[in-house]
Amino acid sequence: MWPQPHLPTHPHLPTHPHLPTHPHLPTHPMMSKETRQSKLAEAKEQLTDHHPQTNPSVGTAASDTKKKKINNGTNPETTTSGGCHSPEDEQKASHQHQEALRRELEAQVHTIRILTCQKTELQMALYYSQHAVKQLEGEARDLISRLHDSWKFAGELEQALSAVATQKKKADRYIEELTKERDALSLELYRNTITDEELKEKNAKLQEKLQLVESEKSEIQLNVKELKRKLERAKLLLPQQQLQAEADHLGKELQSVSAKLQAQVEENELWNRLNQQQEEKMWRQEEKIQEREEKIQEQEEKIREQEEKMRRQEEMMWEKEEKMRRQEEMMWEKEEKIRELEEKMHEQEKIREQEEKRQEEEKIREQEKRQEQEAKMWRQEEKIREQEEKIREQEKKMWRQEEKIHEQEKIREEEKRQEQEEMWRQEEKIREQEEIWRQKEKMHEQEEKIRKQEEKVWRQEEKMHDQEEKIREQEEKVWRQEEKIREQEEKMWRQEEKIREQEEMWREEEKMHEQEKIWEEEKRQEQEDKMWRQEEKIREQEEKVWRQEEKIREQEEKRQEQEEKMWKQEEKIREQEEKIREQEKIREQEEKIREQEEMMQEQEEKMGEQEEKMQEQEKMRRQEEKIREQEEKIREQKEKIREQEEKIWEQEEKIREQEEMMQEQEEKMGEQEEKMWEQEEEMQEQEEKMRRQEEKIREQEKKIREQEEKIREQEEMMQEQEEKMGEQEGKMCEQEAKMQEQEEKMRRQEEKIREQEKKIREQEEKIREQEEMMQEQEEKMWEQEEKMCEQEEKMQEQEEKMRRQEEKMREQEVRLRQQEEKMQEH
């Protein structure tokens, strides 16, 4: 056994605490040859020193032993030669044996060199692979920390989405409450308009009566003057007693008239006070309405600010999602690199296993060769006993070397154990990587959950659309109720016409009775004074009602404007959601749809203008039936427009389905464009129909003017009839019995007037209830403002959290950049 040379460590490889120190090859291959030649020369010198020619004692001893062995027949080589063996043959045999040993040593040294070179290469590869694995471990830790941050951020985003959803629900509830209040106010306004119209008609009738009473007053004054003249004449003719009686009678009549006048004055003062109080209440209501409008404007501004904040947050969310996607892409790339390194590690492990197998085979071969050499050595022991001492010394050296080799083998076994431990560590790292893979799968599952939440949001939006359709159905019900109320108004008009006919009959009868009975006329004058007072009260009430109606109309207009703003805001929100979910390829379709929406808005504006015209025409009392027909046509048009809107909604749903099937969408685009053209043609036809309706309305206005001219002609005929009634003074005696019946009718009218006063009181109570409702609404507005403040505080807290998250993301980006720079440096 020959000693193995000491292999120094490689100078270029850095020492690592985890890597074991192994023996390496020398830096230059010529050093091994020189050492080998020097050792061979020393062995030759030792052999020459121990040769039998130089040392006779050794030779004799050797010859004696050889002879004994030859005689015993133990050596097969010397038995054939007949007991003679020359020293030259021994030298040749020893020389051949040394050459064979040299060849074996050279082969072993060559294999050792190859193995050491392979070992150094493997150690280098192992070092670089371990270094790369450590870098990947650091990157994996960074990625895990980022994943945790991203999970936290996703949770915060979910909380923000839930908060936004709650805010949206609150806004929807507030909108529903406003719509309910608007409907209630519209009904009250409609009732007030009906009562106003009734009061106007009554005022017109009372004005006509006033005119008649004034004419009667003028006639009575003339009669009084004539009576005074007659009295003056009678004073001259009649005695003083009769004059005193008549004067007393006239004085009593004057006192009664003065008392009636004072009562009328007091009543007028009371009515004036009531009017002032009602005006003050109306002013207060107007101030409250203005304050509410200001609050509503402030709330709208706050809502706009919140919408802007929401838009900004959505933009930040999109940016962060893009960053998360980029980070995921980086994670995928790093995972691919890790996989490549794992494959390389597997290849290196296979190479190591192959090398170990080769080493084991070489060891087996070496053992077999050693066994053969030992057999040869045993055969040559008899011949080379002289060299036994040297060989023993060499064997001692070899034993020492073998001990060193055993120690080296132990070291190798320890190194193998360490390598196995490292392999275990690598397996643990692989397990950690598998856990990272599982975490990524969890992230994908969370993304799927987020997508499901988005689908839920879409479903909620569809529910909102269904609610809007329900609101439209409620509006249709309100329209039907209005039609019923209009039918009731028609019935009231018919009753009022009957009352007018009765009043005309009254006028004719009054003219007949005025000429016959002056005293009865005075009683009637008292009744007429009462009627005048009542008429003044009614006028004051009508003025108050008119003012209330004007204020209510202004409130309705403002509410309509607010509703339009809310609708516009909802449309903006819908457009934003559509823009977020639609892709770049559908932008052209969105532009077309927006153009259609603009056309629809223009048509709606035109319809609004037409509705205003219709409202102006509704004031014409005698054309309500024709206007109703027009309103029915307009409703049909609105229903058509709603159907078109539903078609547009259906088209939008089709567009969403087309996002998944883009190939089918390209084929259906042509069909959709054709449908759009057909819809535009239908819109043009509708515009033509609207123009025709306007022409019909103008024709109706002409007819109304003709009817007014006819009414004037009828009034002239009535005046002629009144002149003819003067000729019928002789027939008034027969109508005295009818006067009693008419007095009963007057009493009934007084009862009706009292009932009207009760109704007016009920209206005042309703106005008070409205004021209470307004106060409750103000309290609700205050509560809503407080909630809005709380929401703003929450939004500020969320913004602070978002800023902190942005700072964390920036720090992570800086770390990533530093890591990338380090990777580039390596």
Swiss-Prot record:
Keyword check for Coiled coil: yes
Please list the coiled coil stretches.
157-822
Record's keyword terms, sorted: Coiled coil
Could you tell me where the Basic and acidic residues compositional bias lies? Answer: 31-52, 86-100, 658-678, 686-826
The region called Disordered is annotated at 1-100, 297-327, 345-425, 502-534, 547-646, 658-826
- Give me the stretches of Polar residues compositional bias: 53-63, 71-83
Protein's UniProt keywords contain Coiled coil: yes
Look up the signal peptide feature and give its range: none
Q: Which family does it belong to?
A: Belongs to the GOLGA6 family.
Name of the featured protein = Golgin subfamily A member 6-like protein 25
Lineage, uppermost ranks: Eukaryota, Metazoa, Chordata, Craniata, Vertebrata
